[in-house]
Structure formats: C-alpha cells, structure tokens
C-alpha cells in the first residue's frame, strides 16, 4: 500500500521476501511512490553457503532503485539470535541505485537527504514508469491462470 508521508512525498513498503518477487515490486511501483521502504529480516548464510545475502540484497535493491528511479530505504536487524547472525547493512539508496548512507556493522541510525528533483530526473532518463503498459501486462497475465 502507498501512504502519503508529507506533502509531495509518498512511500510504499514491501517486506523482505516481497522484494524477491519482481511482479510484486512492479505492481507496487505502478503507483509511483516517491520512496520504497524495505524492512528485511536477513541473516548471513541462511539461504546456503553459496548465496551471499549481503551481496545479493545490495544487487537487488540497487536494481529496483535504478530501474524505477525511486530511492530505497532498507532496514535490517543486526546481531546474533540463536545460531544465526543478522548482518545489518541498513542503507538508503538514491534514485539511480547509488548508496547515500549505509550502516556500519553495528546498530546505528543513518540518514540521507533525498531530492524530488533528482528523482524526477532519474525517472525521465530511464522511463520504466512512463513506458509501463499496465493493460498489456494484464492481458498477457490472463493466459497464466
């Protein structure tokens, strides 16, 4: 769902595994939120020894920020619980996928300044929103029931 957070700014939240489903992300981004909030609950090595949650979350979030010209605010836990270690890595990405702020390997508060002008420019340069053809996607999906 999309929420207005202040005049001219809106946010959509997708929680953890939702961000690994491109269809859910695309559907959420069709509303053109100003910011995507991404609270996750990711531990190191929890998927497999060959899958780096730390590296792959960075790739995933950069891709969506850049593709949709939308800043991403990601939060993750830090510290041990049971046999798992939650790696933290909370970050704020700009509308081109650039890292504006990133937490160190500890609990901490981060902040960054976001610009609606930078968002508009990024969206103009990579027109994912503008070229999204929702009726076409809907029609194509009808064949997969």
Language-model regions, residue ranges each:
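Cysteine/selenocysteine-centered motifs that mediate thiol-based redox chemistry or coordinate metal-sulfur cofactors
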Residues: 2-19, 23-34, 38, 45, ...
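Short beta-strand-to-turn element immediately C-terminal to the catalytic PLP-Schiff-base lysine
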Residues: 4-6, 93-94, 112-113
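CN hydrolase (nitrilase-like) catalytic-core segments centered on the catalytic cysteine
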Residues: 19-110
């Amino acid at each position: 769902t999309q929420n207005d957070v202040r005049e001219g700014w809106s946010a959509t939240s997708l929680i953890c595994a939702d961000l690994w489903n491109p269809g859910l992300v695309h559907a959420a981004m069709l509303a053109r939120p100003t910011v995507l909030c991404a609270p996750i609950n990711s531990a190191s090595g929890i998927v497999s020894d060959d899958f780096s949650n730390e590296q792959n979350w960075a790739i995933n979030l950069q891709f969506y920020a850049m593709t949709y010209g939308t800043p991403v605010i990601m939060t993750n836990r830090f510290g041990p619980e049971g046999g798992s270690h939650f790696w933290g890595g909370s970050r704020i990405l700009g509308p081109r996928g650039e890292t504006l702020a990133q937490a160190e390997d500890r609990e901490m508060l981060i902040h960054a300044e976001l610009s609606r002008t930078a968002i508009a420019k990024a969206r103009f340069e990579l027109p994912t929103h503008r070229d999204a053809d929702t009726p076409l996607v809907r029609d194509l999906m009808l064949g997969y029931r």
